[in-house]
Amino acid sequence: QLNMLDTLDVFTRKHSENVASLTCRICEYLHCTKGFTEYCTICAYLHDIGKLYIPPQILQKPGRLTDEEFEIMKTHTTIGYDICMKDLKLRPYAAGPLYHHEALNGTGYPQGLTKKDIPYEAQIITVADEYDAIVSKRQYKTHIGISDTLKLIIENAQPGKGLDKSSALSEISSIAKLGKVNPIIVKCLFKVVLDDIYYEITCTQSYLDDIQDDLNLSLIHISEP
């Protein structure tokens, strides 16, 4: 059943692999059980399976999507859910495709759920998905450096931050805005990047100090989430 992902375009397939790998590492840092970690990882791998039925001209469009195109793109969540629910072996993992674009503050889709109603596995997958979508060189995004990505994700996961930081941030459609992601999970993401050198990025102590000074954060050196 998982072989159907091989028919996705090469970028979406690689993105699914990245999100699954990062989700697994986040679960490990959260000290999740082995069973829950395996479950989350498969949910993450399947999270974009609904894109099998999104027209290529929309999925691979190099420019920004129109409102109409974005509405079509959003259907990949419910399409993915339906694919999983129709297969007995995939049915347990249907939460990954359905909920990975929900936001803690209720601004997500397809159901506009808030934190108390969003499954925890989906909250983890959302953070991994946000990170990989920003770091990866997408057809419809300009490549953003790892340093800026980490700063933006963590900065916008802190309480009291505005939704619109600047005109520059408005270009980053996937950035984690106020209330959108779970900051506890973001902390684990940050440690994953530093400790596991995700995307083969090395970080010096001076780099860490710069981020901490810029964002006035103390979470960087926390050993437990």
Specify the residue positions occupied by each region the protein language model found.
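Histidine- and acidic-residue-rich, metal-dependent catalytic cores
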Residues: Q1-L219, S223
